[in-house]
């Protein structure tokens, strides 16, 4: 899959129901958010690999408004990169909670959210 830039490729994978991240062939280091070159090294040898879907909550906050509450979380993917997302099905969870990725559609576009382990 090579149509468009890395972000377009990532979104195309999500539309297929696949949570893909990049990995440097030379260092083995995983990369997220999708990029053309690896951070730190500038290597352009990034390949797409399936993410395990596992992560741990690093930080979480709850935004409250008249329309309701929604959390915003930072999770550390089991592969290493940190990702901004939200945790579905709960208002908040303790830091360190194990979560699992799920692809949902919102506003006509697929996105990755997480649910507490055991609720996946």
Question: Where are each of the predicted segments found?
Answer:
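Short, conserved beta-turn/loop elements at beta-strand boundaries and strand-helix junctions
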Residues: 60-66, 106-107
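Conserved hydrophobic positions within beta-strands
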Residues: 55-57
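OB-fold/S1-family single-stranded nucleic acid-binding modules
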Residues: 104-120
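Cys/His-rich short segments
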Residues: 14-52
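Beta-strand/loop nucleic-acid-binding surfaces
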Residues: 81-91
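Short nucleic-acid-contacting surface segments enriched for D/E, G, S/T with interspersed K/R
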Residues: 89-101
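Short, acidic/hydrophobic/Gly-rich beta-strand patch recurrent on exposed beta strands
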Residues: 72-78, 86, 113-115
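Flexible extramembrane loops and terminal tails that flank transmembrane helices
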Residues: 1-18, 110-113
